[in-house]
Amino acid sequence: MNKALFLCLVVLCAAVVFAAEDLQKAKHAPFKRAARCFCPGKPDRGDLWILRGTCPGGYGYTSNCYKWPNICCYPH
């Protein structure tokens, strides 16, 4: 019984390590996970972030408009 419990613990720890490593790679992904959107009065297209209250940092967004419950963020 102890060997089976130890084996389950080892498998669980390995799964946590691999999941954490995968999340580190996802943080530095080269693409945005946003859809296209258009706001009234803006000539360009923006990035629609679904179920967010604010625009995420690090993408250079300077303006936005709300399309409840989503937000459309503009980089210009």
Curated annotation (Swiss-Prot):
Keyword annotations from UniProtKB, A to Z: Cleavage on pair of basic residues, Disulfide bond, Hypotensive agent, Ion channel impairing toxin, Nematocyst, Neurotoxin, Potassium channel impairing toxin, Secreted, Signal, Toxin, Voltage-gated potassium channel impairing toxin
Cysteine disulfide links: C37-C72, C39-C65, C55-C73
Propeptide intervals in chain numbering: 20-31
Classification via Pfam families: Defensin_4
Tissues/organs with expression: Weakly expressed in the ectodermal tissue from the distal and proximal tentacles, body wall, and oral disk.
Molecular function terms, GO-annotated: ion channel inhibitor activity; potassium channel regulator activity; toxin activity
Signal peptide: 1-19
GO biological process, one term: regulation of blood pressure
Main localization, broad class: secreted
An example Gene Ontology CC term for this record: nematocyst
Transmembrane segments: none
Localization per record: Secreted; Nematocyst
UniProt function note: Blocks Kv3 voltage-gated potassium channels. Reduces blood pressure.
Similarity annotation: Belongs to the sea anemone type 3 (BDS) potassium channel toxin family.
Name of protein: Kappa-actitoxin-Avd4l
Species of the source: Anemonia viridis (Snakelocks anemone)
